[in-house]
Amino acid sequence: MDFSRQSFHRSLSSSSQGPALSMSGSLYRKGTVQRLGAAPSVYGGAGGHGTRISVSKAVMSYGGDLSNGSDLFGGNGKLAMQNLNDRLANYLEKVRSLEQSNSRLEAQIKQWYETNAPSTIRDYSSYYAQIKELQNQVKDAQVQNAQCVLRIDNAKLAAEDFRLKFETERGMRIAVEADLQGLSKVYDNLTLQKTDLEIQIEELNKDLALLKKEHQEEVEVLRRQLGNNVNVEVDAAPGLNLGEIMNEMRQRYEVLAQKNLQEAKEQFERQSQTLQQQVTVNTEELKGFEVQVTELRRTYQNLEIELQSHLSMKESLERNLEDVKARYASQLAAIQEMLSSLEAQLMQIRSDTERQNQEHNILLDIKTRLEQEIATYRRLLEGEDIKTTEYQLSTLEMKDIKKTRKIKTVVEEVVDGKVVSSEVKEIEESV
């Protein structure tokens, strides 16, 4: 686009430096009209580049009092009227040129707004909805994290309960093992007693065999003694039958030995059976305890695996939460950066709009003053009071347009190549 903001501002500045109206060359003074020289450019800016309002040179100078206005139209009054007509034509041409420049500038401003400025006010409701959605997602993640923490606490409590049960069962297992060791000692004692009883039975059998042998030897000795004796027949009471007596004694000893042996066997069998039953019961209990210990060990391993899985899931959720927080923080920083940039652009657009409004007001003021000057010349042509004209022209001549200068400073804070914050400072000073 051919329109340049700098050139436009520079032209307006140059146009606003001088007075509103400059009666070039000469001024109307009270009582005299001095010689009019060549007039330089009255307005060189505001779109009227190269436009000059020239005034014809007067051939003669006037003197005397112009309060009555009689000499203005007499003698050399025709030259003055011709000069005023030329100046009026130049002013009218200047007015038309300024109107055309104003129209052109308005078209350029409108075109610039259409190309640079947004056609409508930006609607940030979509960003608000996105921010609300992100906040809801963060809240959901926090709720899920709290639920995971609660599940982890429950798992820890369950693991603690199982640990207590495991300690209790381990104490019971230790007690059962101690009982088994005690029963093993009892079993060993019974085995020793059995061995002692077997040894005693063998010794008794040996004693019985020895007694039988000694008895047989004694019987043989007695028989030999009886065989060597002389038979003497006397009338006496019949003697004792030693053989029968020995047989009876032998039978009684055999019955007694058989009875003792039978009782020892029965007692040994009873004790062995009782011990065998106890060993069987203890073995079954030991197998049951071993099964329970195996199940508890398996349960403990499963709980340990579950605890490790929960811990890994917790770590994963914490990492995901940190990633989500970092991502949302970066997105929020990007949104804030974009909002700051948009606010800076909006402030820039507002300042440009205000500056262009001021420039437009300056142009309107120039146009108004030109219209006032045209009206003044019209009244001069119609023969109005010259004193009033002189006073108005002097007032317009002495009135200057204030020139102001705006200094705009943009301060941006950059972190890791990203704009974190942006601040626009604007200072207005008069020149």
Swiss-Prot record:
Protein task: Plays a significant role in maintaining keratin filament organization in intestinal epithelia. When phosphorylated, plays a role in the secretion of mucin in the small intestine.
Annotated coiled-coil segments of the chain: none
Annotated GO CC locations: cytosol; intermediate filament
Miscellaneous information on this protein: There are two types of cytoskeletal and microfibrillar keratin: I (acidic; 40-55 kDa) and II (neutral to basic; 56-70 kDa).
Disordered, as annotated region: 1-23
Biological process annotations from GO: apoptotic process; cellular response to starvation; intermediate filament organization; regulation of protein secretion
UniProt-listed PROSITE patterns: IF_ROD_1, IF_ROD_2
ATP-binding is among the record's keywords: no
All copies of domain IF rod, residue ranges: 77-388
Gene encoding the protein: Krt20
Linker 12 as annotated region, ranges: 223-245
InterPro entries referenced in this protein's UniProt entry, alphabetically: IF_conserved (IPR018039), IF_rod_dom (IPR039008), Keratin_I (IPR002957)
Protein family according to the UniProt entry: Belongs to the intermediate filament family.
Modified-residue entries (Phosphoserine), positions: 13, 16, 26
Coil 2 as annotated region, ranges: 246-384
Protein name per Swiss-Prot or TrEMBL: Keratin, type I cytoskeletal 20
Residue ranges of the region described as Linker 1: 113-130
